[in-house]
Amino acid sequence: MTIQTDGKTDVLWFLPTHGDGRYLGASEGARDVSLPYLRQIAQAADDLGYYGVLLPTGRSCEDSWVVASALAPLTQRLRFLVAVRPGLQEPSMAARMAATLDRISDGRLLINVVTGGDPVELKGDGVFLDHDERYVVTDEFLHIWRGLMAGETVNFEGKHLRSENGRVIFRPVQAPYPPLYFGGSSPAGIEVAAEHCEVYLTWGEPPAGVAEKIAKAREAAERKGKTFSYGIRLHVIVRETESEAWEAADRLISRLDDATIAQAQATLKRQDSVGQSRMMALHGGDRNKLVVSPNLWAGVGLVRGGAGTALVGSADQVADRMKEYIDLGIDRFILSGYPHLEEAYRFAELVFPKLPLRATTGTAPSTARNNGPFGEVIANDIVPTRRVSAH
Protein backbone atom coordinates (compact mmCIF):
# COMPACT_ATOMS: atom_id res chain seq x y z
CA MET A 1 0.00 0.00 0.00
CA THR A 2 1.68 3.24 -1.16
CA ILE A 3 0.37 6.78 -0.89
CA GLN A 4 1.34 8.88 -3.90
CA THR A 5 2.20 12.56 -3.47
CA ASP A 6 0.87 15.24 -5.80
CA GLY A 7 2.58 18.43 -4.66
CA LYS A 8 -0.30 19.28 -2.34
CA THR A 9 -0.59 18.86 1.40
CA ASP A 10 -2.93 17.71 4.15
CA VAL A 11 -3.01 19.52 7.48
CA LEU A 12 -3.98 17.72 10.67
CA TRP A 13 -4.60 19.32 14.06
CA PHE A 14 -4.06 17.92 17.56
CA LEU A 15 -6.34 16.89 20.43
CA PRO A 16 -4.60 17.86 23.71
CA THR A 17 -5.75 14.95 25.85
CA HIS A 18 -2.75 15.53 28.14
CA GLY A 19 -3.68 19.13 28.99
CA ASP A 20 -4.12 22.56 27.45
CA GLY A 21 -3.73 26.18 28.43
CA ARG A 22 -2.28 29.58 27.65
CA TYR A 23 1.13 29.06 29.23
CA LEU A 24 3.64 26.22 29.30
CA GLY A 25 4.70 24.72 32.62
CA ALA A 26 2.10 26.58 34.70
CA SER A 27 -1.39 25.99 36.02
CA GLU A 28 -2.34 29.61 35.34
CA GLY A 29 -4.58 29.74 32.30
CA ALA A 30 -4.94 25.94 32.26
CA ARG A 31 -8.02 24.18 30.89
CA ASP A 32 -9.77 21.00 31.85
CA VAL A 33 -9.51 18.63 28.88
CA SER A 34 -13.02 17.32 29.37
CA LEU A 35 -14.92 15.50 26.66
CA PRO A 36 -17.02 18.62 25.92
CA TYR A 37 -13.82 20.64 25.39
CA LEU A 38 -12.25 17.98 23.17
CA ARG A 39 -15.52 17.83 21.25
CA GLN A 40 -15.29 21.57 20.59
CA ILE A 41 -11.78 21.18 19.17
CA ALA A 42 -12.69 18.15 17.06
CA GLN A 43 -15.82 19.75 15.64
CA ALA A 44 -13.96 22.99 14.94
CA ALA A 45 -11.25 21.06 13.09
CA ASP A 46 -13.95 19.19 11.17
CA ASP A 47 -15.79 22.37 10.19
CA LEU A 48 -12.59 24.25 9.29
CA GLY A 49 -11.42 21.55 6.88
CA TYR A 50 -8.51 19.97 8.71
CA TYR A 51 -7.74 16.53 7.28
CA GLY A 52 -7.65 14.93 10.71
CA VAL A 53 -6.45 15.13 14.30
CA LEU A 54 -3.62 13.39 16.12
CA LEU A 55 -4.43 11.92 19.52
CA PRO A 56 -1.34 11.53 21.75
CA THR A 57 -0.60 8.34 23.65
CA GLY A 58 1.06 7.48 26.95
CA ARG A 59 0.35 7.62 30.64
CA SER A 60 0.15 11.43 30.60
CA CYS A 61 -2.85 11.28 28.23
CA GLU A 62 -6.43 10.14 28.23
CA ASP A 63 -6.76 6.88 26.30
CA SER A 64 -6.73 7.75 22.62
CA TRP A 65 -8.99 4.89 21.50
CA VAL A 66 -11.73 5.76 23.95
CA VAL A 67 -11.56 9.46 23.08
CA ALA A 68 -11.58 8.81 19.31
CA SER A 69 -14.52 6.43 19.68
CA ALA A 70 -16.44 9.10 21.58
CA LEU A 71 -15.70 11.83 19.04
CA ALA A 72 -16.05 9.94 15.77
CA PRO A 73 -19.89 9.96 15.81
CA LEU A 74 -19.81 13.70 16.57
CA THR A 75 -17.82 14.60 13.44
CA GLN A 76 -18.40 14.07 9.74
CA ARG A 77 -15.17 14.20 7.72
CA LEU A 78 -12.42 14.42 10.32
CA ARG A 79 -9.93 11.56 10.46
CA PHE A 80 -8.46 10.30 13.73
CA LEU A 81 -4.77 9.40 13.97
CA VAL A 82 -4.68 6.91 16.86
CA ALA A 83 -1.76 4.89 18.20
CA VAL A 84 -1.23 1.17 18.28
CA ARG A 85 1.33 0.25 20.94
CA PRO A 86 3.42 -2.85 20.21
CA GLY A 87 4.49 -4.38 23.49
CA LEU A 88 1.52 -2.92 25.35
CA GLN A 89 -1.19 -4.37 23.08
CA GLU A 90 -1.56 -7.80 21.56
CA PRO A 91 -1.78 -7.49 17.76
CA SER A 92 -5.08 -9.36 17.51
CA MET A 93 -6.79 -7.12 20.06
CA ALA A 94 -5.30 -4.02 18.45
CA ALA A 95 -6.54 -5.22 15.05
CA ARG A 96 -10.09 -5.72 16.30
CA MET A 97 -10.07 -2.29 17.94
CA ALA A 98 -8.78 -0.67 14.77
CA ALA A 99 -11.23 -2.48 12.50
CA THR A 100 -14.16 -1.52 14.70
CA LEU A 101 -13.14 2.13 14.98
CA ASP A 102 -12.58 2.31 11.23
CA ARG A 103 -16.03 0.89 10.71
CA ILE A 104 -17.94 3.07 13.17
CA SER A 105 -16.14 6.15 11.83
CA ASP A 106 -16.95 5.08 8.25
CA GLY A 107 -13.33 4.81 7.17
CA ARG A 108 -11.85 7.79 9.03
CA LEU A 109 -9.16 6.00 11.06
CA LEU A 110 -5.42 6.54 10.62
CA ILE A 111 -2.94 4.43 12.59
CA ASN A 112 0.09 5.85 14.40
CA VAL A 113 2.61 3.11 15.25
CA VAL A 114 4.27 4.06 18.57
CA THR A 115 7.06 1.87 19.93
CA GLY A 116 7.78 4.17 22.87
CA GLY A 117 10.97 5.89 23.97
CA ASP A 118 10.79 6.33 27.75
CA PRO A 119 12.19 3.25 29.54
CA VAL A 120 10.78 4.40 32.90
CA GLU A 121 7.23 4.73 31.59
CA LEU A 122 7.55 1.52 29.58
CA LYS A 123 8.62 -0.45 32.66
CA GLY A 124 5.56 0.90 34.42
CA ASP A 125 3.55 -0.56 31.55
CA GLY A 126 5.31 -3.92 31.82
CA VAL A 127 7.79 -3.50 28.95
CA PHE A 128 11.39 -4.24 30.00
CA LEU A 129 13.10 -4.43 26.60
CA ASP A 130 15.93 -2.25 25.35
CA HIS A 131 15.62 0.19 22.45
CA ASP A 132 16.42 -2.08 19.50
CA GLU A 133 14.59 -5.08 20.94
CA ARG A 134 11.42 -3.01 21.19
CA TYR A 135 11.63 -2.51 17.43
CA VAL A 136 11.88 -6.29 16.99
CA VAL A 137 8.56 -6.51 18.84
CA THR A 138 7.13 -3.74 16.66
CA ASP A 139 8.18 -5.58 13.50
CA GLU A 140 6.56 -8.82 14.67
CA PHE A 141 3.45 -6.98 15.85
CA LEU A 142 2.96 -5.34 12.45
CA HIS A 143 3.48 -8.59 10.55
CA ILE A 144 0.59 -10.08 12.51
CA TRP A 145 -1.57 -6.94 12.63
CA ARG A 146 -1.36 -6.27 8.89
CA GLY A 147 -2.22 -9.85 8.03
CA LEU A 148 -5.23 -9.86 10.33
CA MET A 149 -6.52 -6.55 9.02
CA ALA A 150 -6.12 -7.75 5.43
CA GLY A 151 -8.41 -10.69 6.14
CA GLU A 152 -5.75 -13.38 6.35
CA THR A 153 -5.69 -16.30 8.75
CA VAL A 154 -2.40 -15.57 10.47
CA ASN A 155 0.07 -18.16 11.68
CA PHE A 156 3.25 -16.52 12.91
CA GLU A 157 6.05 -17.42 15.28
CA GLY A 158 8.62 -14.78 16.13
CA LYS A 159 11.08 -14.11 18.88
CA HIS A 160 8.50 -12.35 21.05
CA LEU A 161 5.07 -12.87 19.47
CA ARG A 162 3.08 -15.86 18.20
CA SER A 163 -0.23 -16.22 16.43
CA GLU A 164 -2.02 -19.44 15.59
CA ASN A 165 -5.00 -19.25 13.23
CA GLY A 166 -5.52 -15.59 14.08
CA ARG A 167 -8.45 -13.88 12.39
CA VAL A 168 -10.40 -10.63 12.29
CA ILE A 169 -13.97 -11.32 11.23
CA PHE A 170 -15.31 -7.76 11.03
CA ARG A 171 -13.05 -6.09 8.49
CA PRO A 172 -12.14 -2.38 8.32
CA VAL A 173 -13.72 -0.06 5.75
CA GLN A 174 -10.33 0.92 4.32
CA ALA A 175 -8.67 -1.86 2.35
CA PRO A 176 -6.51 -3.58 3.21
CA TYR A 177 -6.29 -1.47 6.40
CA PRO A 178 -6.04 2.18 7.51
CA PRO A 179 -2.78 3.92 6.53
CA LEU A 180 0.12 3.35 8.92
CA TYR A 181 2.06 6.38 10.16
CA PHE A 182 5.43 5.83 11.84
CA GLY A 183 7.98 8.15 13.45
CA GLY A 184 11.39 6.70 14.24
CA SER A 185 14.79 8.35 13.85
CA SER A 186 17.05 5.42 14.73
CA PRO A 187 18.28 2.93 12.10
CA ALA A 188 16.11 0.24 13.72
CA GLY A 189 13.04 2.46 13.57
CA ILE A 190 13.59 3.48 9.96
CA GLU A 191 13.94 -0.16 8.89
CA VAL A 192 10.66 -1.13 10.55
CA ALA A 193 8.92 1.85 8.97
CA ALA A 194 10.23 0.89 5.53
CA GLU A 195 9.00 -2.67 5.96
CA HIS A 196 5.46 -1.90 7.07
CA CYS A 197 4.30 1.70 6.87
CA GLU A 198 2.99 4.23 4.37
CA VAL A 199 3.78 7.55 6.06
CA TYR A 200 7.14 8.36 7.63
CA LEU A 201 6.93 11.07 10.31
CA THR A 202 9.52 13.41 11.74
CA TRP A 203 9.39 16.03 14.44
CA GLY A 204 9.96 19.62 13.36
CA GLU A 205 13.70 19.88 12.90
CA PRO A 206 15.26 22.59 10.71
CA PRO A 207 14.98 21.84 6.99
CA ALA A 208 18.51 20.42 6.75
CA GLY A 209 17.79 17.89 9.49
CA VAL A 210 14.47 16.93 7.93
CA ALA A 211 16.13 16.48 4.53
CA GLU A 212 18.71 14.19 6.12
CA LYS A 213 16.04 12.03 7.73
CA ILE A 214 13.94 11.87 4.57
CA ALA A 215 16.98 10.76 2.58
CA LYS A 216 17.63 7.89 5.01
CA ALA A 217 13.99 6.86 5.06
CA ARG A 218 13.71 7.03 1.27
CA GLU A 219 16.82 4.87 0.86
CA ALA A 220 15.44 2.26 3.27
CA ALA A 221 12.08 2.22 1.48
CA GLU A 222 13.67 1.92 -1.95
CA ARG A 223 15.62 -1.14 -0.82
CA LYS A 224 12.24 -2.75 -0.16
CA GLY A 225 10.67 -1.50 -3.38
CA LYS A 226 8.41 0.98 -1.58
CA THR A 227 7.71 4.70 -1.62
CA PHE A 228 6.93 6.71 1.50
CA SER A 229 4.73 9.70 2.01
CA TYR A 230 6.31 12.09 4.53
CA GLY A 231 4.78 14.03 7.41
CA ILE A 232 6.08 16.50 9.98
CA ARG A 233 4.87 17.32 13.50
CA LEU A 234 5.11 20.98 14.54
CA HIS A 235 3.53 23.58 16.78
CA VAL A 236 2.53 26.88 15.23
CA ILE A 237 2.27 30.46 16.48
CA VAL A 238 0.85 32.61 13.69
CA ARG A 239 -0.38 36.18 13.94
CA GLU A 240 -1.16 38.98 11.51
CA THR A 241 2.36 40.38 11.98
CA GLU A 242 5.70 38.78 12.80
CA SER A 243 6.19 40.94 15.89
CA GLU A 244 2.83 39.85 17.28
CA ALA A 245 3.78 36.20 16.72
CA TRP A 246 7.09 36.52 18.59
CA GLU A 247 5.32 38.33 21.42
CA ALA A 248 2.90 35.39 21.63
CA ALA A 249 5.83 32.94 21.71
CA ASP A 250 7.42 34.88 24.56
CA ARG A 251 4.12 34.89 26.48
CA LEU A 252 3.78 31.14 26.08
CA ILE A 253 6.94 30.53 28.16
CA SER A 254 6.65 33.63 30.34
CA ARG A 255 5.61 31.60 33.40
CA LEU A 256 8.54 29.15 33.09
CA ASP A 257 11.31 29.40 35.67
CA ASP A 258 14.77 27.87 35.42
CA ALA A 259 14.00 25.17 37.99
CA THR A 260 11.03 23.90 35.98
CA ILE A 261 13.10 23.84 32.80
CA ALA A 262 15.93 21.95 34.52
CA GLN A 263 13.51 19.40 35.97
CA ALA A 264 11.86 18.86 32.60
CA GLN A 265 15.16 18.48 30.76
CA ALA A 266 16.43 15.95 33.32
CA THR A 267 13.26 13.89 32.89
CA LEU A 268 13.46 14.00 29.10
CA LYS A 269 17.12 12.94 29.11
CA ARG A 270 16.19 9.53 30.52
CA GLN A 271 14.55 8.65 27.21
CA ASP A 272 16.44 6.47 24.73
CA SER A 273 14.56 7.93 21.76
CA VAL A 274 16.91 9.19 19.04
CA GLY A 275 14.26 11.64 17.87
CA GLN A 276 13.91 13.07 21.38
CA SER A 277 17.68 13.49 21.64
CA ARG A 278 17.69 15.39 18.35
CA MET A 279 14.92 17.68 19.62
CA MET A 280 16.79 18.45 22.84
CA ALA A 281 20.05 19.12 21.02
CA LEU A 282 18.42 22.01 19.16
CA HIS A 283 18.32 24.22 22.27
CA GLY A 284 20.32 22.43 24.98
CA GLY A 285 17.85 23.58 27.62
CA ASP A 286 18.95 27.21 27.13
CA ARG A 287 16.09 29.67 26.72
CA ASN A 288 18.50 32.07 25.01
CA LYS A 289 19.07 29.65 22.11
CA LEU A 290 15.55 28.97 20.95
CA VAL A 291 15.53 30.30 17.38
CA VAL A 292 17.05 27.32 15.58
CA SER A 293 16.16 28.24 11.98
CA PRO A 294 14.26 31.08 10.29
CA ASN A 295 10.83 31.25 11.98
CA LEU A 296 11.51 27.95 13.78
CA TRP A 297 11.45 28.26 17.58
CA ALA A 298 12.35 25.53 20.09
CA GLY A 299 10.72 27.07 23.17
CA VAL A 300 8.05 24.38 23.48
CA GLY A 301 10.76 21.74 23.87
CA LEU A 302 12.04 23.33 27.09
CA VAL A 303 9.32 21.47 28.99
CA ARG A 304 7.48 19.29 26.48
CA GLY A 305 8.56 15.89 25.23
CA GLY A 306 8.11 14.89 21.62
CA ALA A 307 7.38 17.73 19.23
CA GLY A 308 9.28 20.69 20.66
CA THR A 309 9.45 23.28 17.89
CA ALA A 310 7.00 25.83 16.52
CA LEU A 311 6.74 27.83 13.34
CA VAL A 312 6.47 31.46 14.46
CA GLY A 313 5.60 34.40 12.25
CA SER A 314 3.05 36.08 10.04
CA ALA A 315 0.75 34.02 7.84
CA ASP A 316 3.00 34.58 4.84
CA GLN A 317 6.12 33.56 6.77
CA VAL A 318 4.55 30.42 8.21
CA ALA A 319 3.19 29.42 4.80
CA ASP A 320 6.59 30.03 3.21
CA ARG A 321 8.36 27.86 5.80
CA MET A 322 5.78 25.12 5.26
CA LYS A 323 6.33 25.30 1.51
CA GLU A 324 10.06 24.80 2.13
CA TYR A 325 9.23 21.54 3.89
CA ILE A 326 6.86 20.62 1.06
CA ASP A 327 9.75 21.11 -1.38
CA LEU A 328 11.71 18.53 0.65
CA GLY A 329 8.92 15.97 0.18
CA ILE A 330 6.65 16.65 3.16
CA ASP A 331 3.01 16.32 2.15
CA ARG A 332 1.24 16.31 5.50
CA PHE A 333 1.59 18.53 8.54
CA ILE A 334 0.42 17.66 12.05
CA LEU A 335 0.11 20.97 13.86
CA SER A 336 -0.93 22.32 17.23
CA GLY A 337 -1.05 25.60 19.13
CA TYR A 338 -1.90 26.83 22.60
CA PRO A 339 -4.77 26.98 23.41
CA HIS A 340 -5.79 24.42 20.82
CA LEU A 341 -9.34 25.60 20.22
CA GLU A 342 -8.56 29.22 19.38
CA GLU A 343 -5.40 28.38 17.47
CA ALA A 344 -7.22 25.84 15.28
CA TYR A 345 -9.38 28.71 14.05
CA ARG A 346 -6.52 31.18 13.79
CA PHE A 347 -4.30 28.92 11.71
CA ALA A 348 -7.10 27.88 9.36
CA GLU A 349 -8.26 31.45 8.84
CA LEU A 350 -4.80 32.95 8.29
CA VAL A 351 -2.76 30.20 6.62
CA PHE A 352 -5.10 27.77 4.84
CA PRO A 353 -5.71 30.22 1.96
CA LYS A 354 -1.95 30.36 1.34
CA LEU A 355 -1.32 26.59 1.17
CA PRO A 356 -1.73 24.04 -1.66
CA LEU A 357 -4.28 22.03 0.28
CA ARG A 358 -5.89 18.83 -0.87
CA ALA A 359 -9.67 18.87 -0.72
CA THR A 360 -11.02 17.33 2.46
CA THR A 361 -13.69 14.83 1.47
CA GLY A 362 -15.76 12.37 3.42
CA THR A 363 -16.05 8.69 2.68
CA ALA A 364 -19.03 7.18 0.89
CA PRO A 365 -22.05 6.76 3.16
CA SER A 366 -23.15 3.41 4.51
CA THR A 367 -19.88 1.58 3.80
CA ALA A 368 -19.54 0.22 7.35
CA ARG A 369 -21.46 -3.01 7.32
CA ASN A 370 -20.39 -6.35 8.74
CA ASN A 371 -19.34 -7.50 5.27
CA GLY A 372 -22.74 -9.07 5.19
CA PRO A 373 -25.45 -9.09 6.40
CA PHE A 374 -25.05 -12.73 7.37
CA GLY A 375 -26.59 -13.06 10.84
CA GLU A 376 -24.76 -13.88 14.05
CA VAL A 377 -21.34 -15.52 13.88
CA ILE A 378 -21.69 -19.24 14.67
CA ALA A 379 -19.78 -20.48 17.75
CA ASN A 380 -17.80 -17.22 17.80
CA ASP A 381 -15.81 -18.39 14.77
CA ILE A 382 -17.89 -19.36 11.72
CA VAL A 383 -19.51 -16.93 9.32
CA PRO A 384 -22.87 -18.28 8.12
CA THR A 385 -22.94 -19.00 4.41
CA ARG A 386 -25.56 -17.40 2.24
CA ARG A 387 -28.04 -19.94 0.86
CA VAL A 388 -29.09 -19.49 -2.75
CA SER A 389 -32.81 -19.92 -3.31
CA ALA A 390 -33.86 -22.42 -5.95
CA HIS A 391 -36.17 -21.07 -8.64
From Swiss-Prot:
Catalysed transformations (reactions) = an alkanesulfonate + FMNH2 + O2 = an aldehyde + FMN + sulfite + H2O + 2 H(+)
UniProt keyword annotations, A-Z = Flavoprotein, FMN, Monooxygenase, Oxidoreductase
Under the heading SUPFAM superfamilies, the entry gives: Bacterial luciferase-like
Q: Which GO terms describe its biological process?
A: alkanesulfonate catabolic process
Per the record's keyword annotation, is Glycoprotein included, yes or no? no
Write out the GO MF terms: alkanesulfonate monooxygenase activity
Q: What is its EC number?
A: 1.14.14.5
What InterPro entries does its record include? Answer: Alkanesulphonate_mOase_FMN-dep (IPR019911), Luciferase-like_dom (IPR011251), Luciferase-like_sf (IPR036661), SsuD_RutA_monooxygenase (IPR050172)
Q: Which residues form the signal peptide?
A: none
Alphabetized Pfam families for the sequence: Bac_luciferase
Primary role: Catalyzes the desulfonation of aliphatic sulfonates.
* Family of the protein in this entry: Belongs to the SsuD family.
Q: What is this protein called?
A: Alkanesulfonate monooxygenase
**Organism of derivation:** Methylorubrum extorquens (strain CM4 / NCIMB 13688) (Methylobacterium extorquens)
